[in-house]
Structures are given as C-alpha cells and as structure tokens.
Design a protein with these regions (language model features):
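A short acidic, glycine-rich active-site loop
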Residues: 40-60
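Conserved beta-strand termini and adjacent loop/short-helix elements that scaffold enzyme active sites
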Residues: 23, 79-81, 136
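Structural beta-alpha unit
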Residues: 27, 63-103
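Short, well-ordered secondary-structure micro-motifs
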Residues: 30-33, 89-90, 115-116
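Small/aliphatic-rich secondary-structure junction motif
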Residues: 1-47, 68-77
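Gly/Ser-rich helix-loop-strand patches that form or flank binding pockets
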Residues: 94-137
Length: 137
C-alpha cells in the first residue's frame, strides 16, 4: 500500500476529510528535464510534473486518488502548492495553516544502510511538522 492508499483508509475509518497535496518548487532547474528545455513543458525525469498549468497538474496527480476516494466514500480536497520554498517547508506550512491533524507521507524504499535514513523531504516533515506524521514505505 502506498501513502495515498493509507490516507484514504484512515479517512474512511475515521470519517475524515482527505487532503491530497502536490507540492513542488515553482521553478525547477532545466537539468532535470528530458530534453533540457524548460520551454517545452516536458515532464521531469522520474515521472514528476513540472511547468504545467495548475489544472493539468491536478488532473495528472489526483485522478487515481479522486477515483479511489469516490469508491470508498471519502471526501477529498486536492491542493497544488507551487512556491519557491522547499517541498518539505510547503507541506509543513500547508498543514499548519489548514489545521491538518495527521500527515501521511511516502518515502522511497531503500536498502542496506540507506534503509536507516528517511528521504530528505520525509525526514524534514517528520522533524518539523506540528502534528503527527505517518511515513509509508
């Protein structure tokens, strides 16, 4: 199960609203683009989304989550946060400003020594968030 699925499960169990948040820096360095050209609106290597209109980001990021929420009778609010802060800071700020009770965040599976460490975004959110944080591998 991924973080979104856990979030949906918890929202269903506790009859809570689910906020699906997409946070990304507003400007992403062109070195991460498939063709190294920021004007082409290509997606970021690794499946991310960059420099797309807000409605396209929402559609690409939230379509599966919205469908799963509908199937499970879970109220979902979708938000896109594109600022010049770090992704972790944007998540933390959003949670504080919107009285979020629990943050469910995913982290990439690691092996060996790296398994002992969280990703930088998840680690910062766990460290600085005002509310409990559930990290899903």
């Amino acid at each position: 199960m991924d973080a979104a699925e856990y979030g949906i499960l918890l929202a269903q169990k506790y009859d809570a609203n689910l906020i699906a948040l997409y946070a990304s820096p507003k400007i992403i360095s062109s070195e991460y683009y498939e063709d190294n050209d920021i004007r082409t609106n290509k997606s970021v290597l690794g499946g991310g989304i960059a420099e797309l209109p807000r409605h396209e980001i929402e559609e690409k990021s939230f379509s599966k989550i919205k469908e799963k929420c509908k199937q499970n009778n879970v109220r979902v609010i979708t938000e896109v946060v594109l600022r010049n802060k770090s992704v972790a800071a944007d998540i933390i700020d959003y949670a504080e400003n919107n009285n979020v009770n629990l943050i469910v965040i995913g982290t990439k599976g690691r092996t060996g020594f790296k398994r002992l460490l969280l990703g930088s975004v998840a680690s910062a959110v766990v460290t600085y968030a005002h509310c409990p944080v559930m990290v899903v591998k």
